[in-house]
């Protein structure tokens, strides 16, 4: 079950929180859900070069409060706050209302320990036609420097322009998908290449969260019982 279900949805209410927090009349739920989807799409399209990791939405009466988690807060804020103002005006025009929109920009402290930013980095490199094995190896090195407890990367599609699509994955450290208290960050991105679309999935294990404690507890290192998947991956990568 832990291998199939979405890692974030599986842990909602345990170690993960909902990305949209609001209450509304049942008749307005479809309308507000569509608004949330439009807001996220607009922000991701407008700030596609700002390293957006997460977008949180809260509604209070007629006020919408947005929390934008980004690796480059300066790009979002702009000179003198002009970027925030343009974003707010664009959202008001998109929603077609004069509701008050408040934008909070939160900096991601460690971009290499964030699954969304890691998947975005891999996608950008693949779109530049860099060998996927080299990209995955670089991503693993960046994750190791960020001192995460485990990372798993999966790339699917016509890798390196191969005729037959396939799936390759590599894991370093522990990624316990069945453990509900495990703080696992997950992201899915696509890369548009000349050969077609590549799917990228990233799981990052940051430690275990005990109820009543906010910080993740470092998991004890496990003894490897067999040849690691990364070694197998590197052995096959000698030819390409």
Swiss-Prot record:
> What InterPro entries does the record tag this protein with?
KH_dom (IPR004087), KH_dom-like_a/b (IPR015946), KH_dom_type_2 (IPR004044), KH_sf_prok-type (IPR009019), Ribosomal_S3_C_sf (IPR036419), Ribosomal_uS3_bac-typ (IPR005704), Ribosomal_uS3_C (IPR001351), Ribosomal_uS3_CS (IPR018280)
Q: Which Pfam families match?
A: KH_2, Ribosomal_S3_C
Region named Disordered:
219-240
What region holds the KH type-2 domain?
39-109
Could you cite one Gene Ontology molecular function of this protein?
mRNA binding
Please give the biological process terms from Gene Ontology that the record holds. Answer: translation
Cellular component terms (Gene Ontology): cytosolic small ribosomal subunit
Which parts pass through the membrane? Answer: none
Would the keyword Secreted be found if you checked this record's keyword annotation?
no
Which keywords does the record carry? Ribonucleoprotein, Ribosomal protein, RNA-binding, rRNA-binding
Bias regions of kind Basic and acidic residues — which residues? 231-240
Q: How does it assemble?
A: Part of the 30S ribosomal subunit. Forms a tight complex with proteins S10 and S14.
Q: Entry's NCBIfam families?
A: rpsC_bact
> HAMAP family from the entry?
Ribosomal_uS3_B
Of which family is this protein a member?
Belongs to the universal ribosomal protein uS3 family.
Function summary: Binds the lower part of the 30S subunit head. Binds mRNA in the 70S ribosome, positioning it for translation.
Write the protein's name. Small ribosomal subunit protein uS3
Query: Which species does the entry assign this protein to?
Result: Synechocystis sp. (strain ATCC 27184 / PCC 6803 / Kazusa)
Q: Which gene encodes it?
A: rpsC
């Amino acid at each position: 079950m832990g291998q199939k279900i979405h890692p974030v949805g599986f842990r909602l209410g345990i170690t993960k929180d909902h990305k949209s927090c609001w209450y509304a009349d049942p008749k307005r739920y479809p309308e507000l859900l569509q608004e949330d989807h439009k807001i996220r799409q607009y922000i991701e399209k407008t700030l596609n070069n700002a390293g957006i990791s997460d977008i949180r939405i809260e509604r209070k009466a007629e006020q919408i409060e947005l929390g934008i988690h980004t690796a480059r807060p300066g790009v979002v804020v702009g000179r003198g706050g002009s970027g925030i103002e343009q974003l707010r005006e664009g959202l008001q025009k998109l929603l077609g209302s004069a509701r008050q929109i408040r934008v909070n920009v939160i900096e991601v402290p460690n971009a290499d320990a964030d699954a969304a930013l890691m998947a975005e980095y891999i996608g950008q490199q693949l779109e530049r036609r860099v060998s996927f094995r080299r990209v995955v190896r670089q991503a693993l090195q960046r994750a190791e420097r960020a001192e995460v407890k485990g990372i798993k990367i999966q790339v699917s599609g016509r890798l390196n322009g191969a005729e037959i699509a396939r799936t390759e994955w590599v894991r370093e450290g522990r990624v316990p998908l069945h453990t509900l208290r495990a703080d696992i960050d997950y992201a899915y991105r696509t890369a548009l290449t000349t050969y077609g679309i590549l799917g990228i999935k990233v799981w990052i294990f940051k430690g275990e969260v005990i109820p009543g404690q906010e910080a993740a507890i470092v998991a004890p290192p496990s003894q490897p019982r067999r040849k690691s998947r990364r070694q197998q991956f590197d052995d096959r990568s000698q030819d390409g």
